[in-house]
Design a protein with these regions (language model features):
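Beta-strand elements of well-folded, non-transmembrane domains
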Residues: 10-12, 26, 50, 68-70, ...
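A generic structural signal for beta-strand entry/edge sites
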Residues: 3, 41-43, 59-63
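Generic alpha-helical secondary structure
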Residues: 11, 15-19, 23, 39, ...
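Beta-strand residues in well-ordered beta-sheet regions across diverse protein folds
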Residues: 47, 56, 65-67
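Ser/Thr-rich, low-complexity intrinsically disordered terminal regions
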Residues: 28-54
Length: 92
């Protein structure tokens, strides 16, 4: 198991400003349903093969946290890059 935390600063004031852009960016980075997304209030819950995580808005930052088990843990670098890209795109 591997834990992953990403933080991306933003000038946006809350998840309501980021939600649509974050959904679109994640769909682009993870096409074909590779990553399942579910909104629970202002928290985006994520899941995929061997991975569970969430993205929230905390203190002026988008914060992503995930636990990666097999097979996702073997692709940590790629997952970190794609989630980070989506978060930076949404935060801009």
């Amino acid at each position: 198991m591997s834990d992953l935390t990403l933080e991306v600063p933003t000038t946006k004031t809350g998840m309501e400003e980021i939600r649509a852009a974050l959904d679109a960016a994640l769909a682009k980075e993870f096409p074909g349903g590779m990553l399942r997304r579910n909104w629970a209030g202002d928290v985006l819950e994520l899941s995929g093969p061997g991975a569970k995580g969430m993205i929230s808005f905390e203190d002026g930052k988008l914060v992503g946290r995930a636990t990666l088990g097999p097979p996702a843990s073997m692709m940590r670098g790629m997952i970190e890059q794609k989630i980070g890209t989506a978060m930076r795109t949404a935060a801009a």
